Structure formats: C-alpha cells, structure tokens
C-alpha cells in the first residue's frame, strides 16, 4: 500500500474537541502514531513536554526551519507551530496510521506533501458554543479567546478543502464517526496495489 493513505489530519478551532477525539482514536486503534507538534508557546496548565507538545524556544524552532526538519510550520497567535518530518516518515514505514492535530494552514501544506491523506474538520455548531467552551477551559485570557474566535471564523471559510466535517455537539456520536473514518483509511481502493492483487488471481489454466 502507498504510505500516505495512512494519514489522518484533524483540524478545527481550538476548543472544538480535536484533542479528545485524537486520544479516543489512540485508545481504540493500537497501531497509530500521533504526530506531536513542536511549538514555541508556553505550556498550559497540565501540559507535559514530549506528551502534549514538544516545547522549544523560538531560536531552536528557527534552527529547525533552517535544517529542513519540519514538514510544515506556521505562525499562529504569535507562536510558531510545526510538524517534525522524521517521526512521521518512520511511523509510515512501520505501517502505522499517523494522526495530525494541526491548523488549517498546516493542513494545506501537508496535503501538498501527502495528497492521499484524509482530512477531517472538527467544529462546534456555532461561535457562541465555542466561546463557552474556551471560557470553561479557563486557560486563555479574554483577549486570547477573542483572537481564537476571529481565527475560527476564518478557518470555517476553508471547509471545502476537507474530506469530512464533524459538528461536535454529541461527543459519543463524534467518537463513533471519527473511529469509522479512521478504520476505512487502509481500505480505500486507491490505497491498494492493483497489479499485485490481479497477479494473485491469475489462473494459468484459463
């Protein structure tokens, strides 16, 4: 199978539920690899370096850019975010499903690298619900939340570039949907080697 058919990109506004759904997929599908993003922002309360993100200084991040260590990178809310190349390529060679939790900018760049990747946009029903979730999370200032809401509106204008949309109103239902999508990845027809399959069906007596 072609490796890039095992890529699942999750995008959407902060607070829509991407992290929760990613964690669920990792619990339900043993052979997965979560692509840990590298960022220059400070850890939120409860976040662990190397578990939730790779936290680095701006200088370290820029050095990584110069060395070509990132598949994609972008500046979001005045912080650098990027996807490291080596762990992703290693996981693909091992036949794992690689899951990305990245923004819309990152999605566009990754699709250029991996055109067969499957992408899912995850959102709340409307802006008011997203604002409520961000306020309840209690990790951002009011100013930061306003910036996130403005950015979320901009991201919603890019929906047509994604393969699937999940309006995350009912978490259990959203879990079922994302699991179904992930399980179908390796069974898409374009992922198969047709020549190999046809050879297996060859009948010398015909």
From Swiss-Prot:
MF GO annotations: ATP binding; guanylate kinase activity
Binding-site residues, ATP: 12-19
Location of the Guanylate kinase-like domain: 5-183
Intracellular or extracellular location(s): Cytoplasm
This enzyme's EC code(s): 2.7.4.8
Pfam families, per the entry: Guanylate_kin (PF00625)
Keywords: ATP-binding, Cytoplasm, Kinase, Nucleotide-binding, Transferase
Domain of life: Bacteria
GO cellular component entries: cytosol
Leading EC class: transferase
InterPro entries: GK/Ca_channel_bsu, Guanylate_kin-like_dom, Guanylate_kinase, Guanylate_kinase_CS, P-loop_NTPase
Catalytic activity field: GMP + ATP = GDP + ADP
Function text: Essential for recycling GMP and indirectly, cGMP.
Family to which this protein belongs: Belongs to the guanylate kinase family.
Protein name as catalogued: Guanylate kinase
Organism listed in the record: Helicobacter pylori (strain J99 / ATCC 700824) (Campylobacter pylori J99)
Gene coding for it: gmk
């Amino acid at each position: 199978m072609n490796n890039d058919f095992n890529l699942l990109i999750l995008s959407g506004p902060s607070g829509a539920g991407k992290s929760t759904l990613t964690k669920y997929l990792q619990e339900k599908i043993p052979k997965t690899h979560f692509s840990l993003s590298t960022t220059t922002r400070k850890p939120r309360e409860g976040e662990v370096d190397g578990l939730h993100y790779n936290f680095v200084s701006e200088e370290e991040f820029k050095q990584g850019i110069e060395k070509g260590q990132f598949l994609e990178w972008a500046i979001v809310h005045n912080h650098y975010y990027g996807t490291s190349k080596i762990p992703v390529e290693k996981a693909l060679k091992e036949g794992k499903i690689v899951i990305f939790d990245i923004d819309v900018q990152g999605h566009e760049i990754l699709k250029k690298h991996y055109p067969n990747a499957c992408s899912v946009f995850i959102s709340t029903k409307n802006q008011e619900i997203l604002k409520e979730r961000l306020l309840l999370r209690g990790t951002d200032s009011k100013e930061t939340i306003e910036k996130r809401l403005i950015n979320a509106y901009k991201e919603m204008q890019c929906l047509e570039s994604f393969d699937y949309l999940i309006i995350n109103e009912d978490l259990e239902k959203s879990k079922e949907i994302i699991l179904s999508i992930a399980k179908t990845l390796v069974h898409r027809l374009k992922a198969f080697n047709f020549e190999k399959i046809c050879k297996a069906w060859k009948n010398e007596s015909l």
